[in-house]
Amino acid sequence: MESILYIFLPCKKVYPIGVTYLADFIHRRKPDVRQRILDLSLFPKAQRSSAVRDAATEFKPDLVCFSWRDIQIFSPHEGDSSLEHAFNFYFASNPLKRVVASFAGLQQLYRYYSHIRAALSYPWLIAKEFPKAQIMIGGGAFTAFADQLIQKLPEGAIGILGEGEDAILKVIEGQSLENERYILREGKTIRKGQQGAPALLDALTVDLPYLTSIFPQYQEYLGESIGVQSKRGCPYDCAFCLYPYIEGKRVRYRPPSMVVKDISQHYHQWGARRFWFTDAQFITGKEAYPQCTEILERILAEKLEIEWSGYIRTSLITPELAKLMVRSGVGDLEVAITSGSQVVLNNLHMGFKLERLYDGCRYLAEAGFKGKVILN
C-alpha cells in the first residue's frame, strides 16, 4: 500500500491528536507512503459526504482510516442538556418537568441515532464508490462499541480496538493482525485478535512541518488548545470509565524531552499558547512524579509561556508540584470528584480520599493558582 487517507469523524471541534500521532508513526517507518488527514468536524453537515468523496477522488488512497472519537449522548459539557433532561425525566417532582423532559429526550435520541447513521455513512461511501480501498476504523467510540458497530460497517472493514499504530503498519506491509486487537466481519463470521505488545511510546513524537503538509485544515486550530500526550494507560478501576479498557492499565510514559518537543514545535511554528494533556490522568500516581516534574521543568527552562491543562487527580498534588504547576502555566483544571461521599467514591472504585483531593486544591491556592477547578 502506498497511500493512506485518515478521516476524523464529526464531533465537537477538538484537535485530532490521535490521527496526527498515527500519521507521524507511519511516516517515520514508511516515509514513501503518502498520507492525508481530513477532519470532517470542520465541515457543515451537508458538505461532509462531498468532502469525503472529493478527498478520496483526489488522493486515491489505498487505505482509508476512520477515527471515531465520540458516540455518547449524555455529554456533560456546555451546550448539551441531555443529562439534565434525563435527571428531570426520572427524578423531577414536578410532572410538567417530566413531560417536557420526555419530549426533549425524544429529540435528543433522534439526534443521537442520526449522528451514528451519519458516521456510518462515510465508510459505506468509500466502500461503494472506491471499492479498491481497504477500510480501517478505530477511536474511543468504536473501541467501546466495536461488537455492535462492526455489524453495521461494510464487510471486510478492519476495526481496531485501542491503539492503532502497529496494526496500520502491519496492514501496509501485508502482515497478519493476529497479535493486534482487531475485529473483522466476514459474512456472519466475526474474527478477533488480541494485542501482544503495545506500541512503543519512545518513538512517538510529531514532525510538525510534515504534519502541516498533510493536514491542510491545520489552520483551523491556530489559536485553539492543542492536544499533547505524555503517557498512555490508567491504573485505576473507576466503575464508569473506559480508559483502562482502551489504553490498558499499565502506564507507559513518553520521554519528557519528546513531550516538550511537541509543545515547543507547536509554540514556535503554529504560535500555539494553549495545550491540553490528553492522558487519562496527567498524574497517574506517585510513580508519575518524575516524568510530570521534568515536563514542567523543561517548559520553564525553554521559556514556553503557555497555559496548559488536563485531567488531574488533585489528591496527588504535593506542595512542591503545585508550585511547579503554577509557575509553568497551569490553567483551569477538570477534576472528576463524582461525589462528595467517600462511601460512594469507594463503591465506584475511584481510588482516592476526599481529604487528599481537598489538600491538593489547597496546595494550588497557596502556590498562587488563579484558575478554576471544574468539578465533574
Please give the residue ranges for each predicted region.
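Conserved beta-strand segments of the P-loop GTPase G domain that flank and frequently precede/overlap
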Residues: F66-S67, I374-N376
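Catalytic metal-binding/acid-base residues of hydrolase active sites
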Residues: A141-F142, Q281, N376
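Structural motif
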Residues: M136-G140, Y311, I374
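Acidic, low-complexity intrinsically disordered segments
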Residues: M1-D262, Y267-G271
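Radical SAM [4Fe-4S] cluster-binding motif and immediate context
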Residues: D202-G371
